[in-house]
Curated annotation (Swiss-Prot):
This is Adenylate kinase. Its EC number is 2.7.4.3. It is found in: Cytoplasm. Catalyzes the reversible transfer of the terminal phosphate group between ATP and AMP. Plays an important role in cellular energy homeostasis and in adenine nucleotide metabolism.
């Protein structure tokens, strides 16, 4: 099973990715993890990517594609993989298709988790973190017993700058501009599986399994 998963920040993509790889016995390829491993192991591609990252620039698509190719070629991907965090743009998707074709690999499905913008904002801006122990809470879905106070250690709870309304709105804008067009791209291939991400974790996972069996 060779899959790709996409969805906006706050859609629960990471949680579902963990469940998918466990269920199907495939390897989770997160581009973030891939970059960290390449940098840690000082691979030639990792060092190339580091040059751009150190300058605060985006790593060029051809380097990312080469890293994805290297990762997919590893023995642990022989049974299948779940690609998470790439592609993010149409040019990246086209380059990935070309590379997969060269490798003789075809995707079995593209999972797209959909959640309305208002709910994503509520999910992301409601997160609170303990300054002392790092425990996480949510003002609506997982509130502390006493507002602003950590249940575990009594530390002060705060909102990270990443979770501010302005930052969250910007992240969603970038996703909608860059990555949302991929829905049309993959819909044309017949691979796209749109999943309602507003339900419970188990219900969303059941929908994914059902969609992949069709």
């Amino acid at each position: 099973m060779k899959l790709l998963i996409m969805g906006p920040p706050g859609a629960g993509k990471g949680t579902q990715a963990e469940k998918i790889v466990k269920e199907f016995g495939i390897t989770h390829i997160s581009t973030g993890d891939m970059f960290r491993a390449a940098l840690k192991n000082q691979t030639p591609l990792g060092l190339k990517a580091k040059e751009y990252m150190d300058k605060g620039e985006l790593v060029p698509d051809e380097i990312v594609i080469a890293m994805v190719e290297e990762r997919i070629s590893a023995p642990d991907c022989a049974k299948g993989f779940l690609l998470d965090g790439f592609p993010r743009t149409i040019p990246q998707a086209e380059a990935l298709d070309k590379k997969l074709a060269e490798m003789g690999i075809t995707l079995d499905g593209v999972i797209n988790i959909e959640v309305p913008r208002e709910e994503l904002i509520e999910r992301l801006t409601g997160r609170r973190v303990c300054r002392q122990c790092g425990a996480t809470y949510h003002v609506k879905f997982n509130p502390p017993k006493v507002e602003g106070v950590c249940d575990a250690c009594g530390g002060e709870l705060y909102q990270r700058s990443d979770d501010s309304l302005e930052t969250v709105s910007n992240r969603l804008d970038v996703y909608e501009a860059q990555t949302a067009p991929l829905k049309d791209y993959y819909a044309k291939t017949g691979l796209l599986k749109n999943i309602d991400g507003t339900k419970s974790i188990e219900e969303v996972f059941a929908s994914i399994k059902n969609a992949l069996q069709k």
